[in-house]
Amino acid sequence: MHLSSAPLVAWGNAWLSGHVGLDEAVDAVERRGGPNLIGTVPAVDLPFDSGVPLRTALSRLRGLGLSAFRLALPTWGDPLGLVGPKELNQAAVEAREGVLVRLADRQVGLVPSADRRGSSYVGVSWTPYPANDALPQVPGLAEAEQALKLALIEAARAMEGVDDVAPFAPDVHRQLGGLDGGGPSSLARGYPPRAHRVAEQAGRLARVVELAEPSSGRGLTAHQATTRSEGLRRLDAAVRRALVAAHGAIDLSDRGVPGR
């Protein structure tokens, strides 16, 4: 699961909480996805200019009361982390990710897309949208961690109950064996240890879903394929909730003065 929104949320919040400076935060984001800039700004009242670098945009938003970044990881039928209106929700669902940005007097949304130019330039373009002034309905960290564990158990049982002939099935089964030994955390400094742990676990299980999906129907009966698909769907939903909860777990109530 390669996400452009997660690094912006993690490092943006680390900057807002005073744990890193603006330059360090933007550098960390761009190490993941290449140069980041604001794409075409719709013809509405939004505090962005088309084509400006991410660093410039964030500096301007700071002067407008920027106070939080929130991660959205929606899919069709599950608008996780979104608050509307329709235009923002549709764009984020199609991208399967987005960011809510809290300003002093409003909330705006950012939806990423690949910015490819020529044969070698690859970066990220952020399209801004108006967002409804509401809090997204997302789980807390403890709730999301527990749901992830339960979904893992269900998915492991579903895998064991089918005769999978896919060549990478052993890799999937090994990763379904437990939640220990996750990869590097996608979070930045300032997040609590539990959030880092949950993000690591969710990142590894996102890989399980990616490995298992291509073989969901090969060599299986209709019932087996349905069982496997449902287990993976629930695991994917739990992974997305865990990532959203982990990225929202930083304390922004006692901010230092972020570096410029």
Where are these regions (language model features)?
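Intrinsic-disorder-associated interaction segments
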Residues: 1-5, 9, 15-22, 30, ...
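N-terminal intrinsically disordered, low-complexity regulatory tails that precede a folded domain
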Residues: 1-99
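Short, flexible coil/linker segments at or flanking structured domains
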Residues: 3, 87-89, 136, 147, ...
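Acidic-enriched, low-complexity/disordered segments with a strong bias for Aspartate over Glutamate
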Residues: 23, 27, 45, 49, ...
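Glutamate identity and glutamate-enriched acidic tracts
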Residues: 24, 30, 87, 94-97, ...
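Residue-identity detector for threonine
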Residues: 40, 56, 75, 127, ...
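Internal, hydrophobic cores of structured domains that mediate oligomerization or house catalytic pockets
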Residues: 60-158
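Alpha-helical oligomerization segments
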Residues: 157-260
